[in-house]
Amino acid sequence: MANILSIFKTFEIKRLVKFQTLSGPVLILIILSMMVLPLAPFILDLFFTFNIALSIVVLLMSMFTTKTLEFTSFPTILLFSTLLRLALNIASTRIILLNGHIGSCSAGNVIQAFGHFLVGGNFTIGIIVFIILIIINFMVITKGASRIAEVGARFTLDGMPGKQMAIDADLNAGLIGEKQAKKRRIEINQEADFYGSMDGASKFVRGDAIAGILIMIVNIIGGLVIGILQHNMTFSQAAQVYTILTIGDGLVAQIPALVVSTASGVIVTRVSTDQNVSEQIVSQLFCNPQVILLSGIVLGVLGLVPGMPNIIFLIFTTLLFFISWLIYRNPVIFTNFESTMKKIDNTNFCNISDASWNDVQLEGSISIELGNLLIPMIKVNSKKSNLLDKIRNVRKKCAKNIGFLPPLVHIRDNNNLPGNCYCILIKGIEISKGTVQCGKFLAINSGNASGPLPLPAEETSDPIFKFKSFWITSELINQAKQKGYNIAEDSTVISTHLNHIILTHISLLFGRQEAQQLLDYVSKFCPKLIEDLIPNSINLTIFHQVLQNLLIENVPIRDMQTILETLITHAPNYQNDSQILTSLVRISLGKLIIQNIFQNNKIEVIKFDSKLEQILLKTIANKDSVLEPGLYNYIVVKLQQEYNNCKLKNIPCVLLVHHNLRVFIAKMLLKNIPKIFVLSNLELEDVTKIYTTNIIGDQTKT
C-alpha cells in the first residue's frame, strides 16, 4: 500500500512540474491565437474575467510579500499581462466591429456590463471616466513607479561593489559561512536584475495606457464608419452602440491595467522588512497615540465649519479618539504578533544547521557575566550613565596610566548566576564576583562613616576592599553623605571592580598580540627605534617577556622611548635573557618607579641585614642550591609584619635589596606578599635621602 501511495505521489509531483513547465508556452500560444482567430462572446467573457482575476492576484501578491526578491517574476508577469490585455483589445475590437450592429450584447456580457452598468449607459460619462482612468494610470501611478524603479536600479547597481566587499569581510571574519556568502551574492545579483527589469517593464504599462487611448479612438471612428456605411445606421444609433461597446471594452481592460500598475508601485516603493505591506502600514500608522488624538481634534474642528456634514465628522472624530485611547492603553495592539511568532518559529525550527567553526566560542581576554536582573544596566539608550560607557572609560584610563590598551571587555548574560550577581573572568577563568542591586546606590563606609543607615538600607560589603556598605535608594543619598559614606551607582560598582581586576592582573592581559599592537603604534612616533630593535636586536618574544615582567610588578610602560633605547643598548650582550634586560630597563625607569610608589613623598624602605643579604647572595650564586625552609619562613613572616605595619600607616611597603637579589626576592614575595615593592640599590642610585624604617635579620645568627 505504501509503495502504491509513493508511486502516486511521485506521479502527482511530475505532473505538477510538467504543468509549471508548459504553462508559459501555452499562455503565449493562447495570446497569439486571440490576436488571429475570431472569438465567441462567451470565450471573450472568459478571458476578460481571467484578466481581472490575474490583476487582483498580482496586486494581493505584491502586498503580501515581505521582500522584493519573493516576487522576482513580477516584471515577466507585467509583460504577459500587458500582452494579454492588448490581445483582448484586438479580439474585442474585432467582435465589436463585426457584430456591433446587432446590439450591446454582441461583444459579451462583461463588455456590456462595463458599458451600461458602470457608466449608466451614457457614453459621454463613459468617455470621461475612461480618460480619468488613463490619466491616473499613465500620469500618476505608472510615472511614479517608473521613476522609482529607475532610481532603485541605479542605486542597486552602484551599491553592488560595497555589498560584495561587506560579504567578503564577513566571510573572512568568520561571521558567515561559505554557503551563506554564496546565498547573499546570489540575492544581490537577483536584486540588481529585478530592479533593472522593473525599470524596463514599467514602460510596458505606459505603452499600454497610450495604446488604450488610441484603440478607443480607432474603435469609435471605425464603429461609426462601419455602422453608417455598411449597416445603414444613423449617426446617433452608431454613436450610441459602438461608443458604449468601445467604452465598455476600454474600461474592462484599463481597470485591470490600473490594478497591475498599482501592484508595480507597491513592489518598487516597499521597504524590505519582516512584515508585508499591510502590516507595515498598520503598525507604523497607528504606533503613536498622540498623532491619532491630534488628528481627531483637527477633524472635529473641521466638522464645526457651517455646511459640513457634522454627523459624519463626529463619527470619524469619535473613532479616532477611541483608537488613540486604545493604543495608549495597549501599545502593542497593532504590532505584528504573527510575524514575530513566525520569526521565532523560523529561528527555532527552520534555521537549524550543522555545526561549523562559527559555533566555536573562543574565550576573550577579559569578560563580564551578568545575572538576568542586571541586564538593564547595559541598555544603550538608557538615560542614566550605563555600564558600557563606564567600561569604555575604564579601558581609556588603564591605557593612559599603564601604557597599552587593554583588550575589549566582552559582556554576556549567564542564567546560571543569581539574578543580582556578576562575575569577572580573565581568559575564561573566574577571577572575582560580586552582587549589585540594580537601580540602587552603594553607600561605602571606608572608615569615616558614623553609624549604620536606617531601613530600607540593605547591609552588604564593598566587592573590592570588603568595607562595610549599604544598598540604598535615592531618597537616602543625602543622609548617607552626611554620615560620611561614599556613594556609588550600581554600574560604578561593577566598573570600579573591573578596573581593580585589570590593574592587579594586567600582565595576564598583555599577550604577544598586544605587544605587536603596541609596536605598531609606537612605530608611528619612533620608527627608527623599532627598526633597530626588532628583529635586528631582539625578537618579539623577548620584547614581550620584558614588558610583561615590568607589568607583573606594576611598572608602567608609558615611557616606551626609554625602554626601547635601553633594550637597543644592552640587547647585543643579553639578547636572549629577558630577566637581565628587564632589570636594566628598571634601572633606566628608576625615577618613574620611585614616583609611582612614593608619590613625591619621603622615601622610607626596609632593608636586609648585611649578613642575611650575604647568605642570600651565596644561595643564588649556586644555582643548584635552594633557600633553607626555616630562613624562607623567617623572611616571609618578618616581611608580612612589616607590610601590616605599613598598611596601618597608609604608606607603601618597600624592600630595598642588592641588585643581584632583586629578581629572586621579587619572585619569592610575588607568591606570598605581592603588594610589597622590591627595589634594587641601582634603581635608587640617584636618590640622596633614603630613610630605613627597619632592618630584617638583626638578630639572625648565621
UniProtKB/Swiss-Prot annotation:
Topology of this chain in the membrane: Multi-pass membrane protein
This protein's major location comes to membrane
**Where are the disulfide bridges?**
none
What residue stretch is flagged as signal peptide? none
Q: Which UniProt keywords apply?
A: Bacterial flagellum biogenesis, Bacterial flagellum protein export, Cell membrane, Membrane, Protein transport, Transmembrane, Transmembrane helix, Transport
**Protein origin, superkingdom:** Bacteria
Q: Name one Pfam family in it.
A: FHIPEP
Question: Where is the protein found, in the record's own terms?
Answer: Cell membrane
What residue intervals traverse the membrane? Answer: 21-43, 47-64, 76-98, 118-140, 209-231, 251-273, 285-307, 311-333
Cite a single GO BP annotation: bacterial-type flagellum assembly
State a GO cellular component annotated for this protein.
plasma membrane
Q: Which PROSITE patterns match?
A: FHIPEP
Q: Which family does it belong to?
A: Belongs to the FHIPEP (flagella/HR/invasion proteins export pore) family.
Biological role: Required for formation of the rod structure of the flagellar apparatus. Together with FliI and FliH, may constitute the export apparatus of flagellin.
Q: Which PANTHER family match?
A: FLAGELLAR BIOSYNTHESIS PROTEIN FLHA-RELATED (PTHR30161:SF1), FLAGELLAR EXPORT PROTEIN, MEMBRANE FLHA SUBUNIT-RELATED (PTHR30161)
Can you name this protein? Answer: Flagellar biosynthesis protein FlhA
State the organism named in the record: Buchnera aphidicola subsp. Baizongia pistaciae (strain Bp)
